[in-house]
């Protein structure tokens, strides 16, 4: 426990930068009942293009439920989700968003990486797919079956798909699960690439190092309620650190 405390205390945020763009995504009074239980309770937030927002909280806090609701997989919610001032129903949210699950293997369907990058896309841009694979260092594996790739390569494949699929909102569930430190830093760098493309990015994670390396903002959920929402600046790092230290002591 003490070793973890020292290590966490030394990590510094390296992705933080003020985002001066106008918010394009708005969540207003979002609530959701699941099996007669209130699992999301009056959430309100906005996000601008290029933001990388870490979603933190203990198990059962509502992180995954919020993510699935945001991308249209939960439909029985109240409140509003708007994109550029226009309210989105569940079907529209599906069109706007792309979610990468914790185990990427379950959403790799094509028989080659090259085909995976354009899978399910009408009129795909093959040049864009090639450029994405080249940019992410996986072009040499384009003829390989996606499930033969390493964990880090699969994550890069998922990022390549997110670059090609023309979605505005990207949601990642534990993207560094099972990755070593070097691979985690590589994934953090890939998120910076997506940020520069103007994507709105949400990341559900329990990885303190990844939050510090990749995210510009943190939203803390607990029992379906929004507890904190803050920029991940050096001045706010203690808030993130305190959350993880409390979690370790539970």
What residues fall within each predicted segment?
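Conserved ABC ATPase "signature" region
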Residues: 126-141
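Catalytic Walker B motif of ABC-type/P-loop ATPase nucleotide-binding domains
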Residues: 170-173
């Amino acid at each position: 426990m003490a070793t973890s405390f020292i290590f966490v205390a030394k990590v510094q945020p390296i992705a933080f930068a003020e985002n001066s763009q106008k918010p394009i995504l708005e969540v207003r009074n979002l609530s959701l009942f699941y099996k007669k239980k209130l699992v999301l309770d009056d959430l309100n937030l906005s996000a601008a293009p290029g933001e990388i927002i870490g979603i933190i909280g203990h198990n059962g806090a509502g992180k995954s439920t919020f993510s699935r609701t945001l991308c249209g997989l939960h439909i029985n919610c109240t409140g509003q989700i708007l994109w550029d001032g226009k309210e989105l129903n569940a079907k529209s949210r599906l069109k706007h968003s792309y979610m990468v699950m914790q185990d990427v293997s379950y959403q790799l369907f094509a028989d080659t990486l090259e085909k995976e990058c354009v899978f399910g896309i009408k009129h795909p841009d093959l040049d864009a797919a090639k450029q994405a694979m080249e940019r992410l260092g996986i072009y040499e594996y384009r003829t390989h079956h996606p499930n033969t790739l390493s964990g880090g390569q699969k994550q890069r494949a998922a990022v390549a798909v997110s670059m090609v699929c023309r979605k505005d909102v990207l949601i990642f569930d534990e993207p560094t699960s099972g990755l070593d430190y070097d691979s985690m830093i590589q994934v953090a760098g890939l998120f910076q690439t997506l940020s520069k493309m103007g994507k709105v990015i949400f990341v559900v994670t329990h990885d303190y190092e990844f939050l510090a390396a990749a995210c510009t903002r943190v939203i803390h959920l607990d029992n379906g309620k929004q507890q904190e929402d803050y920029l991940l600046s050096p001045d706010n790092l203690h808030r993130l650190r305190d959350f993880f230290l409390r979690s370790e002591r539970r």
